[in-house]
Amino acid sequence: MTKKHHKEQEEIQETIKTEAAEENVGDETVAIPAATESDIEAEIAARDAEIQKLRDEVMRRAAEFENFRKQKEREAAQSGKRMLENTVRDLLPLLDDLKRLMEHIPAELQEMAEAKPFVEGVELIRKNFKSLLESKGVKEIEALGKVLDVNFHEAITQIDVPDTEPDTIVQEYQTGYTLGDRVIRHAKVIVAK
């Protein structure tokens, strides 16, 4: 071999070694900068903080949704109660009229054979109507003989009544009603002076 040929072969071998070293990194340990333990702990802490932040956000959103759901349920229940109150308030004059009708039927008419079924029918309608309202939670406010309570009674006038305490209800002009714990209509009453 000539020197020239020998030199070319050495250059080729050198090139091959260089290329192999560049391509075959697996044969050598690659120098990656080693992360310090404090860097890893800081990264873990940052990720834990982010996870906790996301958990808190999820919990907050869940609580907001639950509050929203409860609020809508309360609003629906209140709306139903208001609707029932308004309906009952509108029906009370009918009950008053049936009561007045029964109070003003003359005794002779009540005893007449021809009128007795009519009178009994009107009384039955009044009782059934009153029972229906009671089944919905409507109750009459007791008034006669009670001391005036402005939460339930409305005094329309005062009269002198011997041997009666002042502010005692002596006559009921219009019956009052409650629905549950709410007054639908105050009892209109006459009280003693």
From Swiss-Prot:
Gene Ontology biological process terms in this record: protein folding
Disulfide-bond pairs as recorded: none
Comp. bias intervals (Basic and acidic residues): 7-20
Gene Ontology molecular function, alphabetical: adenyl-nucleotide exchange factor activity; protein homodimerization activity; protein-folding chaperone binding; unfolded protein binding
Chain spans, region Disordered: 1-26
Localization per Swiss-Prot or TrEMBL: Cytoplasm
InterPro entries associated with the record: GrpE (IPR000740), GrpE_coiled_coil (IPR013805), GrpE_head (IPR009012)
A GO cellular component entry from the record: cytoplasm
Superkingdom of this protein's organism: Bacteria
Chief site of localization: cytoplasm
PROSITE patterns: GRPE
Keyword list, A-Z: Chaperone, Cytoplasm, Stress response
Family: Belongs to the GrpE family.
Subunit structure: Homodimer.
Chain's role: Participates actively in the response to hyperosmotic and heat shock by preventing the aggregation of stress-denatured proteins, in association with DnaK and GrpE. It is the nucleotide exchange factor for DnaK and may function as a thermosensor. Unfolded proteins bind initially to DnaJ; upon interaction with the DnaJ-bound protein, DnaK hydrolyzes its bound ATP, resulting in the formation of a stable complex. GrpE releases ADP from DnaK; ATP binding to DnaK triggers the release of the substrate protein, thus completing the reaction cycle.
Protein's UniProt name: Protein GrpE
Organism name: Chlorobaculum parvum (strain DSM 263 / NCIMB 8327)
Phylogenetic classification of the source organism: Bacteria, Pseudomonadati, Chlorobiota, Chlorobiia, Chlorobiales
